[in-house]
Design a protein with these regions (language model features):
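Active-site mouth of glycoside hydrolases
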Residues: 4-105, 109-117
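A structural signal for short, well-ordered beta-strand segments and their strand-loop junctions
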Residues: 52, 84, 138, 178-181
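Active-site clefts of carbohydrate-active enzymes
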Residues: 57, 90, 94, 103-105, ...
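Short, structured coil segments at secondary-structure junctions
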Residues: 99-102, 132, 172-173
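Aromatic- and carboxylate-lined catalytic core of secreted/periplasmic carbohydrate-active enzymes
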Residues: 135, 144-146, 160-211
Length: 211
């Protein structure tokens, strides 16, 4: 069996760039580097860990220096683990960090709006042809049971949509695949306020066809 690995996110994206999160924005390039170095020292010998910088956020503007410092801090002491970057929707880590020495493989996010192969022609295929050559994968494809483009009137992504993203990305040369479910990511249950129109308790969604 393949070795199981844990994707570790050093911080939620809203602590760098609030956007739709709660914040507060607490990081600067200086404290991000120190925090990254501390994380690297603490977990450098941990088995089966993959660092995922970003957290559904842009790497542009003021964010660039902060994310770069965080990643550089970790890698300054931790040479043992792979590292990538989780961008916001319909973007790729390669847009900002392809040539960064700490980026071991690219991650794109096809997101929750597109329904055809064109999104991979825009994101994944160009990444695979960039130099230096690095692997790439879709870190956040459409989630099962999430409204298409976040609007209930558009319908919801089903198990067939999940299979489409799997086939389209993997047959294009991706190095892996991510499954997501709207009800599971937020641990939705009756009595909890739903995000993105979640409607099924998470423990029931564990048995959805796409899973």
């Amino acid at each position: 069996f393949p070795t199981r690995r844990s994707s570790d996110l050093p911080t939620w994206g809203d602590k760098v760039d609030k956007q739709w999160g709660k914040g507060p924005e607490i990081f600067t390039p200086e404290n991000a580097y120190k925090y990254g170095k501390w994380l690297g020292e603490r977990y450098m010998n941990a088995p089966n860990l993959i660092w995922v910088i970003g957290g559904d956020r842009s790497g542009d503007g003021k964010n660039f220096a902060i994310w770069n410092a965080l990643a550089t801090g970790i890698k300054s002491v931790d040479k043992n683990h792979l590292m990538t970057y989780h961008p916001h929707g319909e973007h790729s880590s390669s847009f900002w960090f392809h040539n960064a020495s700490w980026l071991d493989f690219n991650m794109c996010q096809s997101g929750h709006a597109q329904q055809d192969f064109a999104i991979y022609q825009r994101l994944l295929l160009p990444d695979l042809n960039k130099e230096p050559h690095k692997p790439c994968m879709d870190g956040e494809p459409r989630y099962e049971n999430i409204p298409i483009n976040f609007k209930k009137e558009n319908g919801r992504f089903g198990d067939d949509d999940i299979r489409h993203t799997l086939y389209q990305s993997m047959f294009s040369g991706a190095c892996g695949y991510t499954y997501g479910c709207n009800d599971i990511w937020q641990m939705f249950d009756t009595g909890r306020e739903p995000k993105c129109d979640a409607d099924t308790p998470w423990y029931q969604s564990m048995d959805k066809q796409g899973a």
